[in-house]
Design a protein with these regions (language model features):
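Alpha-helical transmembrane segments of polytopic membrane proteins
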Residues: 9-14, 84, 304-307
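Hydrophobic transmembrane alpha-helices and their helix-loop junctions in integral membrane proteins
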Residues: 94-97, 103-104, 131, 135, ...
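Cytoplasmic juxtamembrane interface segments
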Residues: 15-31, 176-187
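Transmembrane helix-loop-helix hairpins at membrane boundaries of multipass inner-membrane proteins
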Residues: 2-9, 19-145, 220-228
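Short phosphate-coordinating micro-motif centered on Lys-Gly-acidic
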Residues: 171
Length: 373
């Protein structure tokens, strides 16, 4: 039985949170905040165990037929993806529980803000307005449904084995994050959510242009085919630069960092604790996978620029963190600085530097996640 369950381990880990997110909404609405919390926690815990069990093998992969146009839909958990995948789901699982008291307080605040004034009938009796309990139940249902979709978007991005699949997960991760900031952030939440959406979306579109250039040149979007193919020299550098810029926005590296302090400062704390420790580091993972692994020659040519960019990001983030008076913004700028270390490690073209960058992601995810809690 266990073996049969493990056959589709990664498929379950990625798609169960997406498929069961409507159920989280229904449970929240019908049975309340606590039930929705425990349901989300239990589901993510199960998925985390699947990911950890699958990572025991050196390389674990699953492939499924998809459209012929885009190649194969695959999920790959290897030595590079495993630390990222495990950290993302461990953090999501813990934060599902941490959300319970924090978001309950937030929903109560929102109810006071948004509670409609009682409407009076012509005879002077008040019509019943929405009760606090109903309001909290509805809000927690929506919150946990979005939380689950956000979690699976991050994991899917790390496990993808195909450029189009990577891009789809990349966007799936962005939309719930935008809604979570827009619904429950601190004011002016809508403007900050739009700014976050605009910045990260523009980054994603630039990334897609790089993907299309490579995919159309090779004739396949599958990582395995790209790895073996000779990409024509005239598109190599422009495609690599487009991918690096697109990922630089996700990394919040210097020059593309503007959105992070705002999104971080406004987002509800459990979401800030995912944005900074888990989500922005996915940009570094993608640099490893897409630039270091697939375009080694271009990577060697551009590495000096990555190093300079990394050092600039490191010092800028650190200096700006010292000037903030809001603790969440301090964390945001310190995260920008940490991403500079990752870029610096990736730019070093040495095994130690690359291993150090991956270790940095794990320690940053753990440390920053704990700081927020």
């Amino acid at each position: 039985e266990l073996e049969r369950l493990m056959e589709y381990a990664l498929l379950q880990a990625v798609f169960l949170p997406l498929l069961l997110s409507p159920l989280a909404y229904i449970i929240g609405r019908k049975f309340g905040h606590t039930a929705a919390t425990w349901f989300t926690f239990g589901l993510l815990l199960y998925c985390t165990i699947l990911v950890i069990t699958a990572s025991i093998d050196e390389t674990y992969e699953e492939h499924y037929p998809w459209t012929e146009l885009f190649g194969e839909f695959g999920l790959l958990l290897d030595g590079l993806a495993a630390p990222f995948a495990i950290m993302i789901y461990v953090l999501c699982t813990i934060l599902a529980l941490y959300s319970k008291p924090y978001m309950l307080h937030k929903f109560h605040e929102f109810f006071k803000e948004q509670a409609p004034k009682p409407v009076y009938q012509s005879d002077g009796t008040a019509l019943e307005s929405i009760s606090l309990e109903k309001f909290v139940n509805r809000q927690s249902g929506v919150y946990y449904a979005l939380f689950l979709v956000f979690s699976m978007g991050m994991l899917g991005t790390v496990l993808a084995t195909n450029l189009i699949e990577f891009y789809i997960f990349f966007e799936v991760m962005l939309i719930p994050a935008f809604l979570l900031v827009g619904f429950w952030g601190d004011r002016p939440r809508r403007r900050i959510a739009l700014m976050f959406f605009f910045w990260t979306h523009v980054g994603a579109v630039i990334l897609l242009l790089g993907f299309l250039a490579i995919g159309l040149d090779v004739g396949s979007f599958d990582f395995a085919d790209i790895n073996e193919a000779d990409i024509s020299a005239d598109i190599l550098v422009p495609a690599a630069v487009a991918i690096i810029i697109g990922l630089g926005v996700k990394l919040a590296a210097f020059g593309f960092h503007i959105w992070l302090p705002y999104a971080h400062g406004s987002a509800p704390t459990p979401i800030s604790a995912l944005l900074s420790p888990a989500m922005i580091g996915i940009g570094a993972y993608a640099l490893f996978r897409l630039i270091v692994e697939f375009l080694p020659q271009t990577y060697a040519d551009l590495s000096i620029w990555l190093t300079i960019w990394g050092v600039g990001t490191m010092f800028y983030g650190g200096a700006m963190a010292l000037m903030q008076d809001d603790i969440k913004r301090v964390f945001a700028y310190s995260s920008i600085s940490q991403m500079g270390y990752l870029l610096f490690g990736i730019g070093s073209i040495s095994t130690l530097g690359l291993a150090g960058a991956e270790m940095m992601y794990v320690s940053h995810a753990l440390g920053k996640g704990l700081l927020f809690m």
